[in-house]
Structure formats: structure tokens, C-alpha cells
């Protein structure tokens, strides 16, 4: 299978792309090189090789849900740079 300039023109129109004539020839050559490489992969003997669905086994990386005591207001505000009563005090943002 090979790609022609007509094929590249059609694909470019679908993708709403515009190429000059030299770019069309470059794209045609590059696509043909890619297809040639893929055809070489078809020549590889894969008899007896198990198909892979992915490289890594899925692993649950979440920790167990453990109920902890909530922090008190004073513990939460302990390191606050500025506070007012039980609230964080921040600089005025909107005029």
C-alpha cells in the first residue's frame, strides 16, 4: 500500500489543512515511509507470543479509608499568617 498526493490532498482537506506542492510531496514521502515501517512489523514472527493489553499490571494505589479525628479550629489556624476570630484573614482582592 502506498500513499499518493491525491490521498494526502484528501486527508488535508478533511483536516482543513493547506500544503504547498513541495510540502505535499514531503508529506507523501513521510507517510509512505511510515507505512513501509509498519509493513516491516508485519513480517515479524509472533507465533507463541502472548498478546499484551498493557505494559503494567493495574495496581490499586489508594490507601485504606481510616477515620481520624478532625482538626480543631485552633489547630487549623495555628500556622495562619493572619486570622480574625475563627477565620483566615487574607488581603483584599476585589476593590
Swiss-Prot record:
GO terms for molecular function: asparaginyl-tRNA synthase (glutamine-hydrolyzing) activity; ATP binding; glutaminyl-tRNA synthase (glutamine-hydrolyzing) activity. The gene is gatC. Gene3D superfamilies: Glu-tRNAGln amidotransferase C subunit, N-terminal domain (1.10.20.60). Pfam families: GatC (PF02686). HAMAP family: GatC. Keywords: ATP-binding, Ligase, Nucleotide-binding, Protein biosynthesis. SUPFAM superfamilies: Glu-tRNAGln amidotransferase C subunit. Heterotrimer of A, B and C subunits. Belongs to the GatC family. It catalyses: L-glutamyl-tRNA(Gln) + L-glutamine + ATP + H2O = L-glutaminyl-tRNA(Gln) + L-glutamate + ADP + phosphate + H(+); L-aspartyl-tRNA(Asn) + L-glutamine + ATP + H2O = L-asparaginyl-tRNA(Asn) + L-glutamate + ADP + phosphate + 2 H(+). InterPro entries: Asp/Glu-ADT_sf_sub_c (IPR036113), GatC (IPR003837). Its EC number is 6.3.5.-. This is Aspartyl/glutamyl-tRNA(Asn/Gln) amidotransferase subunit C. Allows the formation of correctly charged Asn-tRNA(Asn) or Gln-tRNA(Gln) through the transamidation of misacylated Asp-tRNA(Asn) or Glu-tRNA(Gln) in organisms which lack either or both of asparaginyl-tRNA or glutaminyl-tRNA synthetases. The reaction takes place in the presence of glutamine and ATP through an activated phospho-Asp-tRNA(Asn) or phospho-Glu-tRNA(Gln). The keyword Protein biosynthesis applies. GO terms for biological process: glutaminyl-tRNAGln biosynthesis via transamidation; regulation of translational fidelity; translation. It is an enzyme of class 6 (ligase).
Amino acid at each position: 500500500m502506498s500513499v499518493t498526493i491525491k490521498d494526502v490532498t484528501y486527508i488535508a482537506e478533511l483536516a482543513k489543512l493547506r500544503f504547498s506542492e513541495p510540502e505535499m510531496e514531503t508529506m507523501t514521502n513521510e507517510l509512505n515511509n511510515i507505512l513501509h515501517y509498519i509493513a516491516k512489523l508485519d513480517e515479524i514472527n509472533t507465533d507463541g507470543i502472548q498478546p499484551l493489553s498493557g505494559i503494567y499490571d493495574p495496581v490499586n494505589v489508594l490507601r485504606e479509608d481510616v477515620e481520624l479525628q478532625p482538626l480543631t479550629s485552633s489547630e487549623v489556624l495555628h500556622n495562619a499568617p493572619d486570622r480574625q476570630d475563627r477565620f483566615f484573614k487574607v488581603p483584599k482582592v476585589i476593590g
